[in-house]
Amino acid sequence: MTAVNKITVLGSGIMGHGIAQVAATVGYNIVLRDIEQSFLDNAMKKIKWSLGKLVEKRKMSQNDADSIYGRITPVVDLKDALKETDLLIEAVPEEMELKKKVYADVDTYAEDKTLYASNTSTLPISEMASLTSRPSRFIGLHFFNPPQLMPLVEVIPGRLTDSRTVSISLDLIRNIGKEPVLCKKDVVGFIVNRIFIPLVHEAAHCLDRDTAEMTQIDSAVKFKMAFPMGIFELADYTGLDVIYKASKEMISRDKKVINPHPLI
């Protein structure tokens, strides 16, 4: 069993409200926190819509949907959001300066028992952990978009993360019905983005060299390599702005990881 009962999710965007819904679905009590009530209102509407779709498809009853929705409490005040929480999952935008400010504020109010987790897709866990008062109880939990559907979660310990935090995190991910993959080293891009981001750039190079057309490249990986989506299709779904930021971050930390294409 995990030592987690109450979870606070910081950030109510696509990832934040998705993570909140996933965890609430299996019975966790969730506080969803953002800096403005309007952001939270929008997030709760999206959660209600998502649960409504599951009811329409007869994947859950209306009573179950209402119970899940009722386990998510939207809160603006950070101090209130962190009361008695066992696990904080930070899902704010991928900007290190913003995360520095967030963790400085969190450290002011978080209780000693609270574990910290970041949903970052590229930023180094060890560096973020060093910004806090508890680097041994800091870990990366990288969910994929949309969290309600994607089964994989990368679990990334920092250099100082202790074994108990790793164990609790792995148990949590399994408890919410996801498949954890443990990254044994806090490397640039972790596992998935270390493979996927360079792949997008290489596909762009193939396109640029007139080796193949975009549809041919996507068809090749879908029908020959059994990818569920084409490389460009997935890049478009992910968002080229997201891929650009991830590429920039990865290159700044290890120039050998990517052969960057100027269009990306």
Identify the residue ranges that each predicted region occupies.
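N-terminal glycine-rich phosphate-binding loop for ADP-containing cofactors
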Residues: 1-264
